[in-house]
Regions:
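Glycine-rich adenosine-cofactor-binding loop
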Residues: 1-12, 328-330
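NAD(P)-binding Rossmann-fold cofactor-contacting core
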Residues: 16-34
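Rossmann-fold NAD(P) dinucleotide-binding segment
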Residues: 40-81
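Rossmann-like NAD(P)H-binding beta-loop-alpha module
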Residues: 51, 98-179, 186
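Rossmann-fold NAD(P)-binding glycine/threonine-rich loop
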Residues: 64-70, 74, 81-122
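Substrate-binding/catalytic subdomain of NAD(P)-dependent oxidoreductase enzymes
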Residues: 156-255, 260-262
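Glycine-rich phosphate/pyrophosphate-binding beta-alpha loops
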Residues: 206, 271-273, 277-283
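A conserved regulatory-domain signal marking ACT and ACT-like small-molecule sensing domains
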Residues: 293-331
Length: 331
């Protein structure tokens, strides 16, 4: 469903294989360059009994939500890269997949090419997860890294990110933290078997970061990074927040360059494990979509959790020192 940047990457991967076949591509316009049937009629796809899996790479809320629900109700597995829908409708979509005995997998929604959710799922098979944390947005990491290493102002670093294709023409959802918050919500829901409401997550983006803040961090032997964090509380609630943080220079997170991500799991017994790689892009994201399809083909059709429960976000117990910039005369 969709054959743009990510969908085109999935198409190329499938064309190189002999064990998978694309039955249809859903597109609003003719695509004569594609070696498969192209249709603008979704009902043709969902009613075809030979189609076992719908791959949703359209993005956005509608019609992606309508199509995903229809596919699940028709008994078809769904693989999606749609972090917006999976953060907003997680509980509803997982429940719908369970009721229809099909798989719903969304590894590509978090971490791009990193097998983050799959590794999180594997950890949960062994032991409880206590915390998830890390750098979940490549655009903001590129901007902060460029400001740190090249001394550029925020606006210049943003323009450079846009020129390289790391930032959208309208980068608002990256800069205000919405993109990383969605990834954090999905990770939190999977890690703790819960449903967190996205608006409850405390969120601060990087739009207010200035070169003087980067310099102040350097004087303290620290590096500014946009960090996501969620931990399970004894009450069953979840502490969940996204904010710029000054990371000590010796930490792995401080050294993450350019548009890369680094996301970590803290398990009850194994401690902290980190996963590093490209956080976005045509082939990294398509790779995770393909891995989900292979998992389904190989019988790994269960959902990330089958015991969802509502969870309240409670950050009242989180005590941390903060850096505050004050404009004024030195006294």
């Amino acid at each position: 469903l969709g054959c743009g940047t990510v969908g085109g990457g999935v198409y190329e991967f499938v064309q190189e294989r002999t064990d998978m076949e694309i039955a249809y591509v859903l597109s609003r316009r003719p695509r004569p360059e594609l070696n498969c049937p192209v249709t603008s009629d979704f009902s043709r796809i969902v009613s075809d009994p030979t189609v076992d899996t719908a791959i949703e790479v359209m993005g956005g809320r509608q019609p992606a939500y309508e199509y995903m629900c229809a596919a699940l109700r028709a008994g078809k597995n769904v693989v999606t890269a749609n972090k917006q829908l999976m953060s907003e409708r997680y509980g509803e979509l997982v429940q719908l997949a369970r009721e229809n005995h099909v798989a719903l997998r969304c590894s590509a929604a978090v971490g791009g090419g990193i097998r983050w959710l799959t590794n999180l799922e594997s950890t949960l098979d062994m032991e409880p997860v206590l915390r998830v944390s890390g750098i979940m947005n490549g655009t903001t990491n590129y901007i902060l890294d460029t400001m740190t290493t090249s001394g550029l102002k925020f606006e210049d670093a943003l323009r450079q990110a846009q020129a390289l294709g790391y930032a959208e023409v309208d980068p608002t959802e990256d800069l205000n933290g919405a993109d990383a918050r969605r990834k954090l919500v999905i990770s939190t829901n999977v890690a703790f078997g819960c449903v967190v409401q996205e608006p409850e997550v405390t969120t601060f983006g990087i739009a207010g970061i200035r070169a003087c803040d980067i310099g102040a961090a350097r004087k303290m032997h620290r590096v500014v990074k946009l960090m996501a964090s969620a931990r399970l509380l004894d009450s069953g609630d979840v502490a969940c927040y996204l904010e710029p943080a000054m990371m000590p220079q010796g930490m792995h997170e401080a050294a993450v360059p350019e548009n890369f991500n680094l996301i970590s799991i803290t398990g009850m017994h194994i401690g902290k494990q980190s996963f590093y790689g490209q956080g976005a892009g045509r082939f990294p994201t398509a790779y995770n979509v393909m891995q989900d399809c292979l998992d389904i083909r190989n019988g790994l059709t269960r959902f990330y959790t089958d015991k969802l429960r509502p969870a309240r976000v409670d950050n009242s117990s989180i005590m941390r020192p903060y850096y505050v910039r004050v404009n004024g005369m030195d006294r």
